[in-house]
């Protein structure tokens, strides 16, 4: 599951759990982006903070793992590089699924090396409340759209709540709330 995870929240975790169950996945690997190219003009928390929040959030689920592949590579993060690295690590016999939000999937036609991206993994677009995605332009054999239990939580809203001094309890895992407070993330 790729994402900025700034911060990771319960919606990410529910989506990963639902997809793992529906597709019979042995594990879900969370891959926090290093330098997200789509957000080059937006402030993004340091990669190490986003990685550690993801580790904290996923620690209690034995099916969840966290990879540093994008963070350790350096430079802008492109999905093609992530998939090539994961393919090299896991081998050709392992089927890769790339879980992402439907909002990100809507922009997939602008992604680098798109044809190879679809050769390396099956994409699962998780729908969010209030977001509709037409899959007419997406290759049906390599893309699935999945509805998960509605959780109207976004990382953008979580950051805004912290900057306004509002609580994050139950929107993100408890350990992530504590990490954000300790590191003073998202405060003005």
From Swiss-Prot:
<keyword id="KW-0067">ATP-binding</keyword>
<comment type="function">
    <text>Catalyzes the reversible adenylation of nicotinate mononucleotide (NaMN) to nicotinic acid adenine dinucleotide (NaAD).</text>
</comment>
<keyword id="KW-0520">NAD</keyword>
<dbReference type="GO" id="GO:0004515">
    <property type="term" value="F:nicotinate-nucleotide adenylyltransferase activity"/>
</dbReference>
<dbReference type="GO" id="GO:0009435">
    <property type="term" value="P:NAD biosynthetic process"/>
</dbReference>
<keyword id="KW-0662">Pyridine nucleotide biosynthesis</keyword>
<dbReference type="InterPro" id="IPR005248">
    <property type="entry name" value="NadD/NMNAT"/>
</dbReference>
<comment type="similarity">
    <text>Belongs to the NadD family.</text>
</comment>
<dbReference type="InterPro" id="IPR014729">
    <property type="entry name" value="Rossmann-like_a/b/a_fold"/>
</dbReference>
<keyword id="KW-0547">Nucleotide-binding</keyword>
<dbReference type="Pfam" id="PF01467">
    <property type="entry name" value="CTP_transf_like"/>
</dbReference>
<protein>
    <recommendedName>
        <fullName>Probable nicotinate-nucleotide adenylyltransferase</fullName>
        <ecNumber>2.7.7.18</ecNumber>
    </recommendedName>
</protein>
<comment type="pathway">
    <text>Cofactor biosynthesis; NAD(+) biosynthesis; deamido-NAD(+) from nicotinate D-ribonucleotide: step 1/1.</text>
</comment>
<keyword id="KW-0548">Nucleotidyltransferase</keyword>
<keyword id="KW-0808">Transferase</keyword>
<dbReference type="InterPro" id="IPR004821">
    <property type="entry name" value="Cyt_trans-like"/>
</dbReference>
<dbReference type="GO" id="GO:0005524">
    <property type="term" value="F:ATP binding"/>
</dbReference>
């Amino acid at each position: 599951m790729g994402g900025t995870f700034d911060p990771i929240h319960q919606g990410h975790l529910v989506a990963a759990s639902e997809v793992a169950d529906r597709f019979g996945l042995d594990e879900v690997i969370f891959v926090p982006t290093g330098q997200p190219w789509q957000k080059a003009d937006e402030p993004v928390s340091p990669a190490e903070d986003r990685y550690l929040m993801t580790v904290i959030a996923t620690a209690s689920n034995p099916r969840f793992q966290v990879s540093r592949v994008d963070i350790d590579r350096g430079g802008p993060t492109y999905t093609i590089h992530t998939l090539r690295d994961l393919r090299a690590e896991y081998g050709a016999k392992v089927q890769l699924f790339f879980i992402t939000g439907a909002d990100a999937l809507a922009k997939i036609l602008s992604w680098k090396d798109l044809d190879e991206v679809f050769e390396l993994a099956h994409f699962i677009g998780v729908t969010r409340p209030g977001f509709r995605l037409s899959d007419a332009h997406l290759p049906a054999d390599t893309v699935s759209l999945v509805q998960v239990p509605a959780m109207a939580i976004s990382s953008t809203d979580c950051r805004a709540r912290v900057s306004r001094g509002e609580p994050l309890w139950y929107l993100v895992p408890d350990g992530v709330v504590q990490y954000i407070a300790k590191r003073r993330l998202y405060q003005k």
